[in-house]
Amino acid sequence: MSGGFELQPQDGGPRVALAPGETVIGRGPLLGLHRNPCYYQSSEKSQLLPLKTNIWCWLNPGDHFSLLVDKYIFCVLSTHSEMEMECTLRNSQMLDEDDILNEIPKSSSADLPDKTPSAPRRERSTETAKPQAAANNMSFIGESRDLSKQQPNPSERKRILPAWMLTENSSDQNLSVISGGNNVTWESEKERVCKDKTQVNITQPGKKRLISSGSSESTSAKQDTGKKCKNDDQEESIISSKEMPQSFSAAMLHNTEIDNTKTNPQRSKVPVEALGKVSEHKIITKGSSNEDSTARSCSESYSSTQSKSFCDKPQKSHPEPSSNPPSPECVQAKATDSVPNGSEENKVQRTSCMYGANCYRKNPVHFQHFSHPGDSDYGGVNITCQDEADDRPECPYGASCYRKNPQHKIEYRHSTFPVRSISDEDDNVGQPNEYNLNDSFIDDEEEEYEPTDEDSDWEPEKEDLEKEDMEGLLKEAKKFMKRKK
């Protein structure tokens, strides 16, 4: 048999791969048992036929052979046929996917004209919203038709974006929209100049998100609500981490909400807030630091004018503020200047390290608690200083403590014990002694035993005897003098 074939045991078990070349049944892993003949069973016949020795027999995929009559039965399988089956299955699945992709844009283009007329029905309360909604509907239908024409071939298998994502991209390309209430125009970076209090030019890199009045926001809210609601939390966290004056965002959101509540109060809150947050995020991410400073100055002047206009509308009696609020950069600089002063006042004086310049420790915690040569507070507090108001316990060894651990010296006081003078040892001061001079026990304690190397037969000379007598007399005299005291 040639390579590319496997044997499947009918009794169960893993397949046996055949080596390329000729394979002899009854040798190697297919060794016969007790010299019994091997049996052959074709796919058409149902009986096992014994094979004759030294005679070739062709085995086709699907045939069976066994080493015993009822055991060790193997089925011949072709790996090439299995690969062809897998390829055919994959091709059929690819064709099914292509058919599904062809049906998707047709249904989307058919649904768009039915959904879009619902926007002008809900916005009949305002007359200005009707032409804008009709224009948006026409643009949606035109884009869907372009999509159906520009569909790629099934063989290319390119990803097709849904209609609401494409409409969002088209709305981003309108760069000259001007809102009626705020007079905010979006221009290129070269033309960014703060003109008047009520007119601000703000530049954004790349795509630019515009806030328009009336129904243009409410109509685009249908397609954009799903995506913007998901990204609301992420945008809030990004905006909060940036340094952007909050008055600008509050003024923009408040003004846009006033314009939108007239047309569609229930459905335009989410897109307006999302648009405001996206515009803030894009304003923050500017190219250079100079552009950041100019954009922030523009936003501050705009916020001051907006606050004036909003205060004048509901309450005309309020006077206008005399000066603009201070810039966040100035406030931040003041805060940073005041922080080091407070930190210097609250700084605790560290303890001087006992090793000084020879300290070998590298632990930063050690440097936080101990000062070293070169520090401003080095030498101010010593570990060995003993104050009267020191609450630490006294070390039992005092100044003669042998421990070298700095932590031990911090936790315990090591004061020197007062040395007793000769006058303190005098017994005349205080109460008199009540010793019994005739007590034999006291005399026995005071007598000292002096070991000698003298033998019992040794007799001392006269000079030695005189020295011993003198020493004994001196001891007795000292004892007598002590007793008198």
Swiss-Prot record:
Biased composition (Basic and acidic residues): 310-319
EC code: 3.1.1.-
Keywords: ADP-ribosylation, Chromosome, Coiled coil, Cytoplasm, DNA damage, DNA repair, Hydrolase, Metal-binding, Nucleotide-binding, Nucleus, Phosphoprotein, Repeat, Zinc, Zinc-finger
Zinc fingers typed PBZ-type, residue spans: 351-372, 393-414
Pfam family, one: zf-CCHH
InterPro entries reported in the protein's UniProt record: APLF, APLF_PBZ, SMAD_FHA_dom_sf
Motif NAP1L motif, chain ranges: 449-473
Modified residues (Phosphoserine): S92, S125
Chain intervals with Polar residues compositional bias: 212-223, 237-249, 286-309
Domain FHA-like stretches: 1-84
TM segment ranges: none
Subcellular location: Nucleus; Chromosome; Cytoplasm, Cytosol
Gene Ontology CC entries for this record: cytosol; nucleus; site of DNA damage; site of double-strand break
Oligomer and partners: Interacts with LIG4. Interacts with PARP1. Interacts with XRCC4. Interacts (via KBM motif) with XRCC5 and XRCC6; promoting recruitment to DNA damage sites. Interacts with XRCC1. Interacts (via C-terminal disordered region) with histones; interacts with histone H2A, H2B and H3-H4.
Similarity comment: family membership: Belongs to the APLF family.
Domain notes per entry: The PBZ-type zinc fingers (also named CYR) mediate non-covalent poly-ADP-ribose-binding. Specifically recognizes branched poly-ADP-ribose chains generated by PARP2. Poly-ADP-ribose-binding is dependent on the presence of zinc and promotes its recruitment to DNA damage sites. The KBM (Ku-binding motif) mediates interaction with XRCC5/Ku80 and XRCC6/Ku70 and recruitment to DNA damage sites.
Name of the protein described by the UniProt record: Aprataxin and PNK-like factor
Species in which this protein is naturally found: Bos taurus
